[in-house]
């Protein structure tokens, strides 16, 4: 049987670094909620069996009317960290018929620049891979190491062979679940899915990402994201 595709959107964060009382995934950008752009990109990929949004149990900001017409499901099973929210979401996918052999693409709600084309490129590249992988970009900037709490440069780090991880991150549901469970048992709270897969001894691949697909994190990021989203994805 051909493995099916599922999308998982952890959306339980508060976005404290964004400088807003409203979680950043619900901020309005170019006329729509930031989360809308992620859901619309996956909705356009009709080959996906389901897109699952993981909310915090006490999320009072989510309003389904802002996402009318898009195909997705919601579960209020978010945990205290991204890793916990993703694990809880993976367990919920069984309710939609997902099996361990199926693929899941985990995507940050705060990356509204994702496009159906990038999603499909990732799937086409990795669908026959035994492990899976992520979209990422080669590091372009010069990297400086500064001690925690300080402002003096300790040294310049080589950027050779360094890539900046993005999402979606695509792995088999069973492999990812077991990798996260192992990380939890060993006391690690990892910041992305590839880290858990690596911790379990596997080797994920990288697929060329896009500058458009950056993560909205700081207050100044919203204006940049709005400018990008106001333009067609293929605009030069």
UniProtKB/Swiss-Prot annotation:
GO molecular function: 2-C-methyl-D-erythritol 4-phosphate cytidylyltransferase activity
CDD domains in the record: CDP-ME_synthetase
Lineage: superkingdom: Bacteria
Residues marked Positions MEP for the nucleophilic attack (site): 159, 215
Catalytic reactions of this protein: 2-C-methyl-D-erythritol 4-phosphate + CTP + H(+) = 4-CDP-2-C-methyl-D-erythritol + diphosphate
Gene3D superfamilies, per database record: Spore Coat Polysaccharide Biosynthesis Protein SpsA, Chain A (3.90.550.10)
Family listed: Belongs to the IspD/TarI cytidylyltransferase family. IspD subfamily.
Name of this protein: 2-C-methyl-D-erythritol 4-phosphate cytidylyltransferase
Organism: Burkholderia cenocepacia (strain ATCC BAA-245 / DSM 16553 / LMG 16656 / NCTC 13227 / J2315 / CF5610) (Burkholderia cepacia (strain J2315))
Gene this chain is encoded by: ispD
